[in-house]
């Protein structure tokens, strides 16, 4: 499913009945959130608010409101095909030379996709059709949503932040929320371990007192946005990965005021800088946990230039207690994670991040257990292998006879195969999401692993329970007379209804 930019993608959605245009005036203050929330919970379409109250710029919401649309954004027809994206990423993380002619033939599609990795640099681009600078820069003219009643101010949610550390060729792309505090100022809420924050720290060390260049793309194409939230190998840029997903090279253009490269077809680009030491209190905001988070200090992003397309569209979302758009993204990206984990840990059968667990705070893993202590090794692997699971507080490991996506199965395994003292692993003083107010210290807390597997010799000295199995011959005999019994059919055999 190929597309060029966000507008091209919206046209595809509209053809499939996946986009609804809202012509009635709707207020970005709370009203858009209410409509988007109801629509998402009903599995409804993406929403294009064409007449935001008080603004002339349309607002796009709920773009990734269903797993199907996430898959479409990644160039796939359905969610099941995302496993192929995961296999490609697993291959790129640890590429292996072909083992023979047949293996070479099997890997040709992967090698062909790699041809779309290099970016294409343009001299002029749609995102620079209009250029605003100086006093003309006014962020309040953008219909930035305020999502919840006690939010501190309007909040940019889908800003694709572009940074580059000193002496680095590769740029970093990250999604960081940004609080509006003035006509040309935003607060950049990036956590200390994120790529943008690390680039800034390195810049401050290498260039004391100098301004740090930053650009933010709003309304980039879906593949580029999704590339910024996917476990891309460190050797692969997000732009290159977006090209793989889209099937065409990512087009970029150099910014007007700095050397950063942004998506050429983005709807809006904010260019500016962060002054070292310029901090401001951010929040509170309702977030994906379903609570308002605490106030904390983060760097101030000063916007010097706004470039945009003619008739630009502002792309936004809201976050709240699941289900919300990040939770839906988590459900879809779960399918990408599975092959990557299986490449490193072949014993993993399935991996599931329940959306009600805020998408990443709890994981259920099923394995083909091979030795005593195996479950604990897998726990440690999940916590350490991908940085996306750095904040996963709970890891439950079960045998492969358990369906990781069925709570009835998982709870049965926990309550029948676990001894709390023996089979619970607690790890203290580990990195924790700064939004997790339950941790004793901001950004630092504990993790729990639950070994809900059958226990092997060395893990127990007792005779282990044997699962009850039905007699297949009896089951077959009852299957043959079940309709005639008419137990669940209002007393009438199937043939008489």
Swiss-Prot record:
Enzyme class name: lyase
Membrane topology recorded in Swiss-Prot or TrEMBL: Peripheral membrane protein
Record-annotated active site: 287 (proton donor)
Cofactor note: Binds 1 prenylated FMN per subunit.
GO cellular component: cytosol; plasma membrane
Major place of residence: membrane
Pathways per UniProt: Cofactor biosynthesis; ubiquinone biosynthesis
Cell compartments where the protein resides: Cell membrane
Family: Belongs to the UbiD family.
Assembly and interaction partners: Homohexamer.
Name of the protein this chain belongs to: 3-octaprenyl-4-hydroxybenzoate carboxy-lyase
Recorded name of the encoding gene: ubiD
